[in-house]
């Protein structure tokens, strides 16, 4: 780095602050920093943020120097602003706090007692830190890329860097001493000691001329009323899951926040921090233990909280027109579903449900009450049906995800822990897996192995999407806007059809009802299916990739970007679909009342249908839900219920074939009447999971048996 002339830079900074202007929409010149200096002079604003893009436009080499030596230039900017402020003061400013009154009183006393011809003692003059009632921060260049924590290394020491991650812990905001003021017990003079680090050694002996000449030996006592304090907070930030290489532990970084950048984030927030990367030498007993090693921290200048739609990453760049055209094919829904874990054979409907979980529904907030849009799914089944593999793939695909197991997770580890802060010794909150997966997916394997007291911590998260904490005097609510993907094994090794769902999974009904879809994946012997599965597994084992199929699997990065694009849509449900959705829900309740349904059917199922429908509309990049979306959502719900119900029908010895089941649906639609529209039959049967060719075959079979007649246009069936 070239040597800089700081005196010349001071003049450039003074010119920049007073003369830099931009033209507004009307073509008028607007002095960007001049207006901020007026507010600073009138104490209407505390923080002045210097945009380095503006500085680069004015003087590019100066902007580069600020980035390379940020701490020094922060001090220079602060001194220049302190010089300029008196000229921008247009009116008298009244005292706003005790320190203002104190400074005003001391200046008045000094002007009275001091002889104008007398040289003022510099040691008793007010230090510049005491007189400055503003803060300076820098906004990084727009071309600056947000780094991951492991990318910030030794070459960034002293430079302005931008880092992104997730907040895991925040301390309470405490007052930090900037200038210590002492009063002598003999001569009454005041001494000031600027504090530039986290610790300092208090001054005891009075340095004034009176005590030194007279050898009075005056003692200094700290005067907190006249000292200056700023707000201080320490934040712990951890890498995002997508930034951690496989097999590595996520790294963390300490963020030191001072003044106006405190209270900008809480545990679970995804943030982008711009600040100065600096070493921290410990003192006292910690230095004896630490030796020559030093810790590092980031002195924050700017903190931005980002949500799921504002992810700052090169991977989340906009899709190109060619990629959108590739995804806009007729079979894009099937193609996206088959691209989920293509190495795993089959489970197409399960993969479709997992795709909708990644996209999610739309949150609703009527009158302050929140109705969640995130979709929760529980996969149950026999061992060896690739439940854990599906969870692992979803964990890798989701931008924000946490993977944990039931046996290795405690309630505290999932929600939040109260930790003792090593800096202040006070209790602080540290977010758990559900907090860290905020606005993402939390995959919990071996869900049935969790202890009951730990599992109760998930109840609030799955419906209210928050975590309420009341521990060690800390009472707060953390965000946990997360989709739960759980995998559970039957309690008896394999699913026992003689027992109910609760007895097989051993999960409480209150928890099972919070899942939008409960899917039972069985390992049933079937020669043709077993042959295809064995060929698929041996091919994957030999070639380390999935077998060639008619549909080419999409790249994981492309899928991630498309899902991110889908999440920006907020589709609504038109009024004309209301009767259709209500009728479908009433039918579900009727079947449950007739004890045909082994699962739970409650009002949560209706909300689940709405969530799945809006997720399907999002997947089409549409702004409104269509009837086909609702029909597909109902079909997935029926398929998940059938996975549980069919096994119990098998156990009872009555296994109706497809045509018999379709006939029962048609008979039910007809009721006491004789005629039924074929379009109504198609809608109801596809909702129940039947294919159109199966419905056509059933109609033809029963027409041959003279059970009903079909009109010439094949639009209506009339029973004989």
Swiss-Prot record:
- Cross-referenced InterPro entries: AAA+_ATPase, MCM, MCM7, MCM_CS, MCM_dom, MCM_lid, MCM_N, MCM_OB
Q: What class of enzyme is it?
A: hydrolase
Please list the residues that bind ATP 2: 514, 604
Molecular function terms from GO? ATP binding; ATP hydrolysis activity; DNA helicase activity; single-stranded DNA binding
Mutation: residue 514 to A; reported impact is: Reduces complex helicase activity
Q: What else is known?
A: Early fractionation of eukaryotic MCM proteins yielded a variety of dimeric, trimeric and tetrameric complexes with unclear biological significance. Specifically a MCM467 subcomplex is shown to have in vitro helicase activity which is inhibited by the MCM2 subunit. The MCM2-7 hexamer is the proposed physiological active complex.
Q: What is this protein called?
A: DNA replication licensing factor Mcm7
Provide the species name.
Drosophila melanogaster (Fruit fly)
Please state the gene responsible for encoding this protein: Mcm7
């Amino acid at each position: 780095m070239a040597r800089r002339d700081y005196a010349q830079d001071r003049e450039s900074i003074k010119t920049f602050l007073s003369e830099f202007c931009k033209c507004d929409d009307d073509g008028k010149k607007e002095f960007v920093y001049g207006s901020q200096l007026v507010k600073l002079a009138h104490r209407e604003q505390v923080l002045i943020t210097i945009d380095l893009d503006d500085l680069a436009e004015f003087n590019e080499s100066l902007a580069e120097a600020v980035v390379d030596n940020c701490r020094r230039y922060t001090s220079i900017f602060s001194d220049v602003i302190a010089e300029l402020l008196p000229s921008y003061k247009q009116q008298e400013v009244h005292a706003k706090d005790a320190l203002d009154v104190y400074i005003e009183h001391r200046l008045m006393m000094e002007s009275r007692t001091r002889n104008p011809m007398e040289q003022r003692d510099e040691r008793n003059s007010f230090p510049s830190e005491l007189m400055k009632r503003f803060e300076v921060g820098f906004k990084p260049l727009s071309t600056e890329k947000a780094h991951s924590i492991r990318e910030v290394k030794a070459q960034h020491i002293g430079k302005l860097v931008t880092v992104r991650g997730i907040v895991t812990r925040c301390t309470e905001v405490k007052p930090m001493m900037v200038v210590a003021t002492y009063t002598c017990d003999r001569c009454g003079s005041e001494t000031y000691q600027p504090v530039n680090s986290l610790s300092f050694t208090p001054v005891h002996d009075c340095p004034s001329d009176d005590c030194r000449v007279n050898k009075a030996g005056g003692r200094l006592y700290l005067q907190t009323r006249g000292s200056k304090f700023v707000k201080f907070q320490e934040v712990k930030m951890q890498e995002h899951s997508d930034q951690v290489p496989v097999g590595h532990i996520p790294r963390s970084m300490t963020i030191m926040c001072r003044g106006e950048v405190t209270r900008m984030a809480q545990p679970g927030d995804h943030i982008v921090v711009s600040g100065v990367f600096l070493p921290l030498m410990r003192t006292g007993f910690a230095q004896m233990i630490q030796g020559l090693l030093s810790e590092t921290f980031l002195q924050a200048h700017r903190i931005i909280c980002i949500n799921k739609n504002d992810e700052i990453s090169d991977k989340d760049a906009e899709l190109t027109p060619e990629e959108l055209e590739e995804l806009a094919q007729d079979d894009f829904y099937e193609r996206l579903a088959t691209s989920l874990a293509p190495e795993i054979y089959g489970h197409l409907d399960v993969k479709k449900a997992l795709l909708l979980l990644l996209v999610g529904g739309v949150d609703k907030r009527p009158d302050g009450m929140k109705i969640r849009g995130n979709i929760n799914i529980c996969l149950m089944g026999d061992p060896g049906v690739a439940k854990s593999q599906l969870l692992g793939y979803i964990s890798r695909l989701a931008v924000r995800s946490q993977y944990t197991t039931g046996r290795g997770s405690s309630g505290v580890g999932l929600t939040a822990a109260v930790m003792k802060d090593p800096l202040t010794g006070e209790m602080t909150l540290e977010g758990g897996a559900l907090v860290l997966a905020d606005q993402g997916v939390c995959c919990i394997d071996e869900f049935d192995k969790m202890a009951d007291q730990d599992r109760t911590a998930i109840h609030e998260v799955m419906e209210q999407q928050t975590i309420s904490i009341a521990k060690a005097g800390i009472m707060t609510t953390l965000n946990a806007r997360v989709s739960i993907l759980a995998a559970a094994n039957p309690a008896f090794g394999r699913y026992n059809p003689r027992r109910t769902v609760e007895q097989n999974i051993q999960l409480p009904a209150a928890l099972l009802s919070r899942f939008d879809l409960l899917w039972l994946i069985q390992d049933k012997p079937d020669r043709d299916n077993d042959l295809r599965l064995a060929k698929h597994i041996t091919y994957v084992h030999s070639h380390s990739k999935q077998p060639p199929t008619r549909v080419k699997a999409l790249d994981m990065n492309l899928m991630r970007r498309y899902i991110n694009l889908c999440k920006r849509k907020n589709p609504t449900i038109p009024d004309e679909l209301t009767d259709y959705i209500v009728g479908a829900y009433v039918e579900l309740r009727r079947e449950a009342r007739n004890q045909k349904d082994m699962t739970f059917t409650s009002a949560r199922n209706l909300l689940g249908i709405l969530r799945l429908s809006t997720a399907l509309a999002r997947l089409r990049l549409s702004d409104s839900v269509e009837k086909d979306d609702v029909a597909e959502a109902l079909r997935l719900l029926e398929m998940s219920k059938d996975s549980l119900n069919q096994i119990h029908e098998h156990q009872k010895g009555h296994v109706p074939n497809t045509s018999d089941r379709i006939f029962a649906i048609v008979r039910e639609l007809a009721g006491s009447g004789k005629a039924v529209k074929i379009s109504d039959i198609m809608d109801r049967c596809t909702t129940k999971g039947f294919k159109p060719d199966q419905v056509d075959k059933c109609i033809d079979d029963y027409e041959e048996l003279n059970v009903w007649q079909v009109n010439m246009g094949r639009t209506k069936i009339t029973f004989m």
